Amino acid sequence: MTPDVNVLVSAFRPDHPHHQPARKWLDEAVRQAANGQASLSLMGVTVTGFMRITSNPKIFKQTDPLADVCGFIDSLLSCPGVQFQQLSSSWPTMRQLCLTQQIKGDLISDAWIAATVMQSGETLCTFDRDFTRLLPSDQLILLKP
């Protein structure tokens, strides 16, 4: 399993309207990873998106200190069974996905995440319904806000 940017942001920020379901999912995913019931991977593209959003004053009036943002990721990575996903050769999958689905603009980042998920065999957890068009249902957990 791997969390999308929106799940990381929501789980991290107690003031986020989706904090409770995101935190519940993330805590359970960490527990399952620690018990060997599931894997939990953090992708570089989602971690950088998380850092970009939580430190952006155009998104949050009260941005989070970068040390806290990095500390959140570090705390996840320190849990047994949680790993930082190594780069994969997702380009051919992303290219094909963008061409067949005519993906452009804001969905390009989502296409990269989807391609990485497909390539790695992971399951993505997100609030973002756009992924229903990018990923097969067995590789997608769509949380309800």
Language-model features: locations:
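Active-site-proximal, substrate-binding regions of enzyme catalytic domains
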Residues: T54-G81, S88, P92, L97-L99
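Acidic active-site catalytic centers that drive phospho-/nucleotidyl reactions
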Residues: D4, D110, D128
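Active-site neighborhoods of divalent-metal-dependent phosphate/nucleic-acid chemistry enzymes
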Residues: C79-C125
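Generic structural signal for secondary-structure transition and capping sites
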Residues: P17, R31-A34, I59, S78-V82, ...
